[in-house]
Amino acid sequence: PVSNLGFLIDVSGSMYGPQRLGLVQSSLKLLVNNLRDADRVAIVVYSGSAGERLPSTSGSDKQKIREAIDELTAGGSTAGGEGIKLAYKIAKKNFVKGGNNRIILCTDGDFNVGVSSNEGLENLIEQERKSGVYLTVLGYGMGNYKDSKMQILAEKGNGNHAYIDNLQEANRVLVNEFGATMHTVAKDVKLQIEFNPSQVQAYRLIGYESRLLKDEDFNNDAKDASEMGAGHTVTAFYEVVPAGVESNFVNKVDDLKYQKKVKPALQPTTGSKELLTVKLRYKAPDEDISKKLELPLVDNKGNNVSSDFRFAAAVAMFGQLLRDSDFKGDATYAQVIAMAKTALDNDERGYRREFLRLVETADGLKQ
């Protein structure tokens, strides 16, 4: 679809430097190179106040857009709330029905003038998202970078969030994965897993602590959830304890002091050999009523797993080590590296090897 984009750029003093505003400028010019003639871009900047630096301009006039980006300089305080309001106002003015209407916020998240509290910014963006304009948040800088705030803003704005620390990462997000970053194909996407108790006696979702939903929210179309872009994939790992297997993590509850322990009655099961059922709900980008899909899975008891699965498992293990999870077991950085090295056969762009370097760096810092 045709894109109506608004670059909302933080040019406050905290964004000074080649790895902040300098990298923002280089990143956005990568995106500009891929604009079509029918696409349009406006540029809004904010520091002590907000202003329109470039009115909505055709993608055919790339040089004009690049020049406006190159002219940006950093200095002053950070009126992020004012900038967000102006960016949404301009995006709504140039709204393309059936198009990709999106604000791209580039910042370190250090809002300190006007609407700057987490709650105030969340409420502002929750109101603005009703217009059908999506929000992509690109984070820059180290030290005072507010990662949690950026993630929350993206979630409230029906959008996505990425951290850009070098030009290679900018190229990945804004060029190689342009469709997944910029084009929403499904909104309010929800997943619900039902395990068969005759096959699984206990389970644990690894990660996603900030994305959990109540069971009843799965069928509630008023409940906000995640958006997915073109070519976007999502991976969720569950750790399970098969039925009949002894585990230290099952039934670790003290006996009641004032009541007799009563063995719970066994729930009747259907006798199904299915391991689980995956339930998916989603809405089309321009619709408000969700669709539901269900897919059962039978465990074939095989140990052959794909390289993608092994790599994702290595990433999950790495995450548990970084946060020193109580459930990390005997996992080590060496095990993460060994597992990831068995899954490098599908790494044309070198992202998996970059992950290996991150793990090796983390291991070195720990020592």
Specify the residue positions occupied by each region the protein language model found.
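Long, acidic serine/threonine- and proline-rich intrinsically disordered regions
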Residues: 200, 208-235, 240-367
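Solvent-exposed coil/turn segments that connect beta secondary-structure elements
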Residues: 12, 46-49, 59, 196-198, ...
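Short aromatic-acidic-glycine turn motif
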Residues: 51-54, 197-204, 287-289
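Extracytoplasmic assembly/pore-lining segments of large envelope/extracellular complexes
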Residues: 181, 185-188, 193-204
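Beta-strand signatures of extracellular beta-sandwich domains
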Residues: 42, 190-192, 279-281
